[in-house]
């Protein structure tokens, strides 16, 4: 339980933190154990996409870097909740960890939106908008997204985020009831950081589904795979981000008393914990469903087997060379694995597409 001062002078709220302190460690440990290795692999596969001149890799790498930044802040938050919401580090570290926690949401939303728009342009308008589907354009968009969130972060650095409760606990990034300056930034976050991107994302995936249904060169099984991927992407996106933003808006509009803050505290913090699972869902949805990723995993597995066997027998390099026919042959035999939204159907390719130029080679479905 903590007695948290909202503005250090006028009002304090005593709120039971028991549920938050019970659930948060479980979520943080799960995201650390699963999310860190998954995002490291995702970063590697994003690099391979960039190496193949696929602009999708730029968005994947930026999305993964944002997730890794947040994951690296989790040990601090884990210590915080295990110490009964008592921040034992400096004020600046609280601000940095808080920024990594909250801004990761909007950086992730931004890059997920970019990926959806990029896939829509590739599928629905394969012969147009080439200038928007280049590495240079992707880097430019990425710079804008990071700059927007860094500028927003400066706003938080101007305010004190570590306050002391009646038990001399130093609480971090918690103000109850919500402060006036927070309302303005929350409205901005809801409208620009969530509502606009989700409208773009939903419109993009609706356009992808429409284009796939109209495609006569795509097998029904592959159409079903794409539809399942799109549906799961939207459902996971909404599950991770919608509850938090609904409650963020509710708090910003109506929270003016301690009683209201107490009433929404558990639901608000539960919804905030849900956003953490996006760090696990991102690499699964956007990397591990790709056929090229299956192929790269086979090659990576072959390399690891080569290293381990070599250390024992000294002959593994001949048995399991990186990219050996055994590994690539397996991928070839599984040519029906879904490339889904990371590749273009041959019917959509132009003479400029790689293996001839500007689009990724392969199939959409």
UniProtKB/Swiss-Prot annotation:
It is a multi-pass membrane protein. Changing residue 17 to F: Decreased but not abolished proton-induced G-protein coupled receptor signaling. Failed to stimulate IP formation at pH 6.8, activity is restored at more acid pH. Abolished response to shear stress. Changing residue 240 to A: Increased proton-induced G-protein coupled receptor signaling. Its main location: membrane. Changing residue 282 to A: Decreased proton-induced G-protein coupled receptor signaling. The record marks 149 as: Required for activation. It is found in: Cell membrane. The record marks 17, 20, 84, 169, 269 as: Proton sensing. Glycans are attached at residues 3, 8. Residues 1-12, 85-89, 161-176, 255-260 are extracellular. GO terms for biological process: cellular response to pH; G protein-coupled receptor signaling pathway; inflammatory response; insulin secretion; monocyte differentiation; negative regulation of monocyte differentiation; osteoclast development; positive regulation of insulin secretion involved in cellular response to glucose stimulus. Changing residue 67 to N: Impaired ability to sense protons. Changing residue 175 to F: No effect on pH-sensing activity. Changing residue 241 to A: Increased proton-induced G-protein coupled receptor signaling. CDD domains: 7tmA_GPR68_OGR1. One of its GO terms (cellular component) is plasma membrane. Changing residue 50 to N: In AI2A6; uncertain significance. Residues 345-365 are annotated as: Disordered. Changing residue 282 to N: Impaired ability to sense protons. Changing residue 159 to F: No effect on pH-sensing activity. Residues 50-53, 126-133, 215-218, 290-365 are cytoplasmic. Proton-sensing G-protein coupled receptor activated by extracellular pH, which is required to monitor pH changes and generate adaptive reactions. The receptor is almost silent at pH 7.8 but fully activated at pH 6.8. Ligand binding causes a conformation change that triggers signaling via guanine nucleotide-binding proteins (G proteins) and modulates the activity of downstream effectors, such as phospholipase C. GPR68 is mainly coupled to G(q) G proteins and mediates production of diacylglycerol (DAG) and inositol 1,4,5-trisphosphate (IP3). Belongs to the G-protein coupled receptor 1 family. A multitude of proton-sensing residues, which include extracellular histidine residues (His-17, His-20, His-84, His-169 and His-269) or triad of buried acidic residues (Asp-67, Glu-149 and Asp-282), contribute to activation of the G-protein coupled receptor activity and pH sensitivity. It is linked to Amelogenesis imperfecta, hypomaturation type, 2A6: A defect of enamel formation. The disorder involves both primary and secondary dentitions. The teeth have a shiny agar jelly appearance and the enamel is softer than normal. Brown pigment is present in middle layers of enamel. This is G-protein coupled receptor 68. The gene is GPR68.
């Amino acid at each position: 339980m903590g007695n948290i001062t909202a503005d250090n002078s006028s009002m304090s709220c005593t709120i039971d933190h028991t549920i938050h302190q019970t659930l948060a460690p479980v979520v943080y440990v799960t995201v650390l154990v699963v999310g860190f290795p998954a995002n490291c692999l995702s970063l590697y596969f994003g690099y391979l996409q960039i190496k193949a001149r696929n602009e999708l890799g730029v968005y994947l790498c930026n999305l993964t870097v944002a997730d890794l930044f947040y994951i690296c802040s989790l040990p601090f938050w884990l210590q915080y909740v295990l110490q009964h919401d008592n921040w034992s580090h400096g004020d600046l570290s609280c601000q940095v960890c808080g920024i990594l926690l909250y801004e990761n949401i909007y950086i992730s939303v931004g890059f997920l939106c970019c990926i959806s728009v990029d896939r829509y342009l590739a599928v629905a308008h394969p012969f147009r908008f080439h200038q928007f589907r280049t590495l240079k354009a992707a880097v430019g968009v990425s710079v804008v997204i990071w700059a927007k969130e860094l500028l927003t972060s400066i706003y938080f650095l101007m305010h004190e985020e570590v306050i002391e409760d009646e038990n001399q606990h130093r609480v971090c990034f918690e103000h109850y009831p919500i402060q006036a300056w927070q309302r303005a930034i929350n409205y901005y976050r809801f409208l620009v950081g969530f509502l606009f991107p989700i409208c773009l994302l939903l419109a993009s995936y609706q356009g992808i589904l429409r284009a796939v249904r109209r495609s006569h060169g795509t097998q029904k099984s592959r159409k079903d795979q794409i539809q399942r991927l799109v549906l799961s992407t939207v459902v996971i996106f909404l599950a991770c981000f919608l509850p938090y933003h609904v409650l963020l808006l509710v708090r910003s509009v109506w929270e003016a008393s301690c009683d209201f803050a107490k009433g929404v505290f558990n639901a608000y913090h539960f919804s905030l914990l849900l956003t953490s699972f996006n760090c696990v869902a991102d690499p699964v949805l956007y990397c591990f469903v790709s056929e090229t990723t299956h192929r790269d995993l086979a090659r990576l597995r072959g390399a690891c087997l080569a290293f381990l066997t070599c250390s024992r027998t000294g002959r593994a390099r001949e048995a399991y060379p990186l990219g050996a026919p055994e590994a690539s042959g397996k991928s070839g035999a599984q040519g029906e694995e879904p490339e889904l939204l990371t590749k273009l159907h041959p019917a959509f390719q132009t003479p400029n597409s790689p293996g001839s130029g500007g689009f990724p080679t392969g199939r959409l479905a």
